[in-house]
Amino acid sequence: MAELTRIEGVLRTEFGKGASRRLRRDGRIPLVVYGNELDPVHVHVDTLDLHALVRNEGVNAVFELNIDGEDNLVMVKAIDQNVLTLDIDHADLLNVKRGERVEVEVPVIHEGLPAPGAMVVQDVDVLLLEVDVLDIPEEIVLDINGLEIGEQILAKDVKMPSNAVLVSDAEELVINIVEPEEEELPEDDEAAAEGEDAAAGEEAEAPAESED
């Protein structure tokens, strides 16, 4: 597999909301590392490093976090983003071991177009999988090209990535191909349309004026 990304972490010495805000102003993101029967470790990393990691490797990224000269294999477990800027305000990491299997939610996307006159409805955005920590897929892509109205893709129909096991309910509906609903006109528009139809009918029924 490709070489893991390595990010330098610094142990935190100050805590609380004020300290976290100061870190973010200085271009740092506070993190907490959990797992493997260790006490939580509070660190901070460069904002650009973490943003690049998540952008390039996804929300389940696995990487080497160096703390005080020691590399720790970790994966992103949860991200807290600013609701306005979408910048990462905080993240939780899970300390893992090579060869360990973990449960992760993997994003699901679809590509292609259904049959003419059909519309695709995606009911779930993620599927829960059990997979080797170093083989976590960034996403699952479903091909919906040419699917007809009434066809569905359930979780059990999704081809699993190598060595991955489906944990989500096998009968969970992922993709549903439906007939588009007719758009209803607002009441005012309907009344106007009916008035126009009635006026057109009256004009058609009116006798033509005789010419002298």
Curated annotation (Swiss-Prot):
GO terms for cellular component: cytosolic large ribosomal subunit. CDD domains: Ribosomal_L25_TL5_CTC (cd00495). The keyword NAD does not apply. GO terms for molecular function: 5S rRNA binding; structural constituent of ribosome. GO terms for biological process: translation. The keyword RNA-binding applies. Keywords: Ribonucleoprotein, Ribosomal protein, RNA-binding, rRNA-binding. Residues 179-212 are annotated as: Disordered. Gene3D superfamilies: Ribosomal protein L25, beta domain (2.170.120.20), Ribosomal Protein L25, Chain P (2.40.240.10). SUPFAM superfamilies: Ribosomal protein L25-like. InterPro entries: Rbsml_bL25/Gln-tRNA_synth_N (IPR020056), Ribosomal_bL25/Gln-tRNA_synth (IPR011035), Ribosomal_bL25_b-dom (IPR020057), Ribosomal_bL25_C (IPR037121), Ribosomal_bL25_long (IPR001021), Ribosomal_L25_dom (IPR029751), Ribosomal_uL5_bac-type (IPR020930). Belongs to the bacterial ribosomal protein bL25 family. CTC subfamily. Part of the 50S ribosomal subunit; part of the 5S rRNA/L5/L18/L25 subcomplex. Contacts the 5S rRNA. Binds to the 5S rRNA independently of L5 and L18. This is one of the proteins that binds to the 5S RNA in the ribosome where it forms part of the central protuberance. This is Large ribosomal subunit protein bL25. The gene is rplY.
